[in-house]
């Protein structure tokens, strides 16, 4: 009464006939044409995602500016939390100098490339 080890060894006392039915929830991906076309489409989408277009120059420059502002913000936090009691004007001027030095460093590295 069992099929491939599935089912009851004996239907006696189980209140069933012991008949084993095929699971309708199981689908064979290789035989179902709807699923194979979906898989092909998914593979094509993954391949298209791997081939990325050239990034826009404005996006790259914006990310670089954000990175610079992050460094300046961390520097400002360090100055504000430091043991020296600096005024806001002094901190602002030091942050501006730091920002200019970073920008000059970036321009020099671009001119070398």
Curated annotation (Swiss-Prot):
CDD domains: cwf21_CWC21-like (cd21372). Keywords: Cytoplasm, mRNA processing, mRNA splicing, Nucleus, Spliceosome. Residues 60-105 form the CWF21 domain. It is found in: Cytoplasm; Nucleus. Coiled coil: none annotated. Signal peptide: none annotated. Its main location: cytoplasm. Residues 43-52 have a biased composition (Low complexity). Residues 29-42 have a biased composition (Basic and acidic residues). It holds the Pfam family cwf21. InterPro entries: CWC21 (IPR051372), mRNA_splic_Cwf21_dom (IPR013170). Residues 11-26 have a biased composition (Polar residues). Residues 1-61 are annotated as: Disordered. GO terms for biological process: mRNA processing; RNA splicing. One of its GO terms (cellular component) is spliceosomal complex. The keyword Cytoplasm applies. Belongs to the CWC21 family. Involved in pre-mRNA splicing. May function at or prior to the first catalytic step of splicing at the catalytic center of the spliceosome. May do so by stabilizing the catalytic center or the position of the RNA substrate. Associates with the NTC complex (or PRP19-associated complex). The NTC complex associates with the spliceosome after the release of the U1 and U4 snRNAs and forms the CWC spliceosome subcomplex reminiscent of a late-stage spliceosome. This is Pre-mRNA-splicing factor CWC21.
């Amino acid at each position: 009464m069992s099929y491939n080890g599935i089912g009851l060894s004996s239907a006696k006392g189980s209140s069933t006939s012991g008949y084993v039915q095929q699971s309708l929830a199981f689908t064979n991906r290789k035989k179902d044409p709807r699923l194979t076309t979906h898989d092909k489409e998914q593979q094509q989408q993954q391949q298209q995602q791997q081939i990325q277009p050239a990034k826009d120059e404005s996006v790259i420059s914006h990310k670089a500016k954000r990175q610079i502002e992050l460094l300046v913000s961390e520097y400002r936090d360090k100055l504000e939390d430091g043991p020296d009691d600096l005024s806001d004007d002094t901190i602002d001027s030091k942050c501006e100098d730091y920002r200019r030095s970073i920008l000059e460093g970036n321009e020099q590295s671009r001119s070398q490339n």
